[in-house]
Amino acid sequence: MLNELEVTQVTIPLPFRLDHVHCFLAEGEKGWTIIDTGLNNKVTRDIWNPIIEKHDVNDIVLTHYHPDHFGYAGTLQALTGADVWMTQVDELAGTTYWEPGSLQFLKGNYDACGIIDDKASALSSDEISFITQVKPYPTVNHHLEEGMKICFGKYEYEVILTPGHSDGLITLYNKENSVLFSTDHILPRISPNISYWFRGINNPLESFFTSLKKIQKLDVEYVIPSHGTLFKNANKRIVELLDHHQDRLNEVYENMKEPITVNTACNVLFKNLSIHESRFAVGETLAHLEYLYSNDQCSKFKREGIWYYQSI
């Protein structure tokens, strides 16, 4: 399929359980275009260097601000002189999240989730460890907006905003071939992490549901994700994701007849995780709790510095 689209997939290894990210390379209107970049580390550099030596890269499109997509963009821009394209909301997130003004609140936020002190410190340290893997930041030259058209390889793609996994996440859609570069919005085997990170949209799970239903209306046949393999029938996978999260919401709701902390709810949903994985689990648990709160299914109150949620 990628050959037919005249697109090259560039797979970058990641040092996590989710062990890779797919970036993409194709000819654009004025030269070569790269979609996403990987972390800023030696593994990524060694993969991109021979590629950019052979291709005149004019544009770098960033689908969202998470480190595995955004991290190497600044260095890649410096090496190629390419323009960087990104949504304005995720440009702001990506260039402020790993700065002292944000990082100083990390441990306090984890404390407020009811997480014990040592683990709260470890979670904060894990987050801070990504600073070197996202800097230098790119200079964003153009802001991506809903409905924009991008020439990539043989075809033109429409930018579709799909907030949920991040507030400014985009997907790219070609109607002619019923193809969607789904980025991290729809993945074939795992559910994208939908987390509330104590800032931005305070009900990201609601945004994710809305974005899934938005794509569902397109009835996409071919889905090219940023993690995992190409698959067919987007709508089948969308139904599976909606059902999965509804099951999670039901599970949380059944366990909050008495006041429950974010940490306790997290332990209901997730087991045997590393510190890195636990950080995402906390964010995803909080997103589910905030969904229930926003939909008037539970109350929320703070006692002795810790947030509690209780079903209504």
Locate the predicted segments by residue:
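Conserved beta-strand hairpin/beta-sheet module of binuclear metal-dependent hydrolase folds
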Residues: 2-55, 171-183
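Short, well-ordered beta-strand micro-motif
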Residues: 25-27, 151, 158, 171-173, ...
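Divalent metal-coordination and catalytic microenvironments
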Residues: 26, 36, 64, 87, ...
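Metallo-beta-lactamase
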Residues: 32, 39, 130-135, 156-246
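Short N-terminal helix/helix-N-cap motif within the alpha/beta-hydrolase-1
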Residues: 43, 65, 70-72, 167, ...
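Active-site HxH/HxHxD metal-binding segment of metal-dependent hydrolases
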Residues: 49-150
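Short hydrophobic/aromatic-enriched beta-strand-loop microsegments
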Residues: 81-86, 181-182, 277
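C-terminal regulatory/interaction regions
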Residues: 251-312
